[in-house]
């Protein structure tokens, strides 16, 4: 049965078949991973006294990689199958099942010095005034060069953008099946004509894009 991309059932299948929230297509990058900007900004803001809230943690790769460098790493996701993997991958972190709607659960109230989201839900922005400590920061990376709801929602809660980065790296999908899967993931149309006219021995080129933003209440 074909599942709707980004539906709960679709994420459950990713957890079951891929062991986490991972790109289900093969890609080859011509340069550094565009998410390295987010990684660098995150790493330089961690420390033994820093309390972190992660929105949309998936199977917990960031909690596993960075959590031990903090005073507390708390994360939430709406998908129970992914949270089960996250708890195994990062036993030192705290995880909560939540879809970002309604009142913030007590376990997520913080306060937190850093709120992060790696291609996760932007709805967390509406909760920043409730969960952020004085001087807290919000760090986000999205899957395209423009994610207009992020600056719009930051303005709505009175937060200021301190920095924006747009990174684009050429990538290749080596097979037609990879291109179809990538387009489904991104909500784009996979056209056979594009493959037939533009694909080379390396596959079809496209731009792997990221939008990174750092914001604060002042």
Feature map (PLM): residue ranges:
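Conserved class I S-adenosyl-L-methionine
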Residues: 1-47, 49-58, 139-159
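A short acidic, Gly/Pro-enriched loop at the edge of an enzyme's catalytic core
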Residues: 105-114
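A short glycine-rich, Lys/Arg-flanked "PGG" loop and its adjoining helix->strand segment in the class I
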Residues: 125-137
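Short "lid" loop at the C-terminus of a central beta-strand within the Rossmann-like core
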Residues: 122, 143-148, 166-171
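Conserved Class I S-adenosyl-L-methionine
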Residues: 166-218
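Class I SAM-dependent methyltransferase SAM/SAH-binding core
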Residues: 59-103
